[in-house]
UniProtKB/Swiss-Prot annotation:
An example molecular function term from Gene Ontology annotations: 5S rRNA binding
Gene: rplY
Assembly with partners or alone: Part of the 50S ribosomal subunit; part of the 5S rRNA/L5/L18/L25 subcomplex. Contacts the 5S rRNA. Binds to the 5S rRNA independently of L5 and L18.
Region of interest: Disordered: 1-23, 191-211
Protein name: Large ribosomal subunit protein bL25
Organism: Dinoroseobacter shibae (strain DSM 16493 / NCIMB 14021 / DFL 12)
Acidic residues bias: start-end ranges: 196-211
One Pfam family hit: Ribosomal_TL5_C
Length: 211
């Protein structure tokens, strides 16, 4: 997410606790709190429709925002949690953490696969299995990547893609200190079944010869 930081407009929220939060929801807002950055927690509220629009747009939890609250200095924040109604799945509360543009933060970044048509394994009918459709990376708050790209060119059935084989965005590092698998190309189910049957026949023949 390099480039201009989008604004997130909020209002100060009077009072804390369940009663104040319920009142905010009745008034058409989603209550929240801003914390971190060496300052006291600040109760806020965001218009329900505006928050819902941003959530539907995607990547809300992976976007650095410029929080604007009337009468206060702008502050950069990232959302760390959105609570939802268990029945309606609508937002009921959110937590925002203060950050500087140079701050480091751990985020799950989606994986994008390209050049499937240039993968011999897929041409043969192999199946691309995304073991990790998202990868947790430590990134700079002011330069959060949209995704990490995995190039499938040249991959055959049985090949795997590990984190060490992927070119990560500048400044991004994995949070897991091992060479974990992101994806692999598996044989088609029909071929796997045929291979299993062949293995069983070979085992039976070997057993018969021993007898």
């Amino acid at each position: 997410m390099a480039g201009e930081i989008p604004d997130l407009v909020a209002e100060p929220r009077a009072g804390t606790g369940k009663g104040a939060a319920r009142q905010a929801r009745r008034d058409g807002y989603v209550p929240g709190v801003v914390y971190g950055g060496g300052a006291d927690p600040q109760p806020i509220q965001i218009k329900f429709n505006e928050l819902l629009r941003r959530l539907k747009a995607g990547r809300f939890m992976a976007t650095l925002f410029n929080l604007k609250v009337e009468g206060q200095e702008d502050v950069r924040v990232i959302c760390r949690n959105v609570q939802r109604d268990v029945v309606k799945d609508l937002p009921t509360h959110l937590d925002l953490m203060r950050l500087r543009r140079t701050s480091k933060v751990n985020l799950f970044i989606p994986v994008e696969f390209i050049n499937e048509g240039a993968a011999p394994g897929i041409k043969k009918g192999g199946v691309l299995t995304a073991v990790r459709p998202e990868v947790e990376l430590r990134v700079t708050a002011g330069d959060i990547p949209e995704s990490i790209t995995v190039d499938l060119t040249g991959l055959d059935i049985g090949d795997t893609v590990t984190i060490s084989s992927v070119t990560l965005p500048e400044g991004a590092t994995p949070t897991i200190d091992r060479d974990f698998v992101i994806a692999n190309i598996q044989a088609p189910s029909g071929l796997r079944s045929a291979d299993n049957e062949a293995d069983e026949e070979e085992t039976e023949e070997a057993t018969a010869e021993e007898v």
